[in-house]
């Protein structure tokens, strides 16, 4: 299998929610690696990942439930733990998830 190289100039951002965009890096059937970009004040609503999730905060500050997060932080959520992200400033995060996201109803 060949190495995959995604140029930043070729990254395709798509709207996820109001003020929240995502860019798939390596996604298959809703699982894999992607970027999430938040405008200050934007929210990713309550959801969980049946297989857990790894988050690296590239830039900005926000809250993941009651946890204050900022650039350089790494968070690993256990499988099935519901959480929401509120951006206090513009935020960029890198997410890796082994299973698709499930949004609360």
Model-derived regions, located:
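Short acidic-glycine-tyrosine-enriched beta hairpin
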Residues: 64-84
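Cytosolic regulatory regions built on CNB/CRP/Popeye-like sensor folds
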Residues: 1-2, 65, 104-105
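Glycine- and acidic-residue-biased ligand/ion/polar-headgroup-sensing regions
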Residues: 40, 49-64
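Ligand-binding loop in jelly-roll beta-barrel domains
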Residues: 79-104
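Short glycine/proline-enriched turns and hinge-like loops at secondary-structure junctions
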Residues: 48-50, 68-69, 87-89
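A short, N-terminal "cap"/entry segment at the start of jelly-roll beta-barrel domains
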Residues: 1-30
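Conserved short histidine dyad/triad with adjacent acidic residue
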Residues: 19-21, 26-49, 76-79
């Amino acid at each position: 299998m060949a190495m995959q190289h995604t140029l930043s100039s070729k990254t395709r951002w798509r709207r996820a929610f109001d003020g929240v965009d995502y860019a798939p890096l390596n996604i298959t059937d809703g699982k894999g690696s992607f970027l999430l970009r938040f405008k200050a004040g934007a929210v990713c609503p309550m959801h969980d990942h049946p297989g857990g999730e790894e988050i690296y905060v590239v830039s900005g500050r926000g809250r993941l439930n009651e946890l204050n997060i900022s650039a350089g932080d790494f968070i690993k959520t256990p499988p099935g733990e519901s959480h929401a992200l509120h951006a206090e400033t513009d935020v960029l995060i890198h997410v890796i998830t082994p299973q698709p996201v499930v949004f609360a109803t």
